[in-house]
């Protein structure tokens, strides 16, 4: 029996002031070019349905502008869906209130942006510890946790280097 970690059902994202009003037109066959030409709205996602099993690896691939980032940003609700359901561990992320969403983002999801923001004046350990110190974790515990994850992503020996001393891929792993 499969264990679904993330389930996305009937997800639509239309960018524009009357997005909700135009969803039914898109469902009835209005394509993205017509939506833009006639209504000056942009179709970001069109009826996306995905099940992601726990402990699986998935790849979201597509051309530039095809909606990959838009889709991913719906999982942690950095973007609000026009319509649809986004479930993580059987919890509908689209229904979380502000405090529940904050808790969800802090403790259950993470995201590494393509242009991540490492602090250039801090070494790798300090960059990794930053989130923990903001959460109030004591220095000893945050250092131990940081060293564990630095090891886990294969950056042993680089703990006290600065971001500009690492390759882009290594910096990406620090961002993880």
Task: Give the location of each predicted region.
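Conserved coupling/switch loops of ABC nucleotide-binding domains, chiefly the family-specific signature
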Residues: 82-85, 141
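Conserved ABC ATPase signature
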Residues: 162-166, 170
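ABC ATPase NBD coupling module
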Residues: 35-40, 94-110, 134, 139
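Helix-to-loop junction immediately C-terminal to a conserved catalytic motif
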Residues: 76
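Short coil-to-helix segment of the ABC ATPase nucleotide-binding domain corresponding to the Q-loop/switch region
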Residues: 121-129
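Conserved ABC ATPase "signature" region
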Residues: 25-34, 89-92, 129, 133-136, ...
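Conserved structural motif at the start of ABC-family nucleotide-binding domains
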Residues: 6, 43-45, 104
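Signature (C-motif/LSGGQ) region and adjacent switch/coupling loops
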Residues: 97, 105, 125, 151, ...
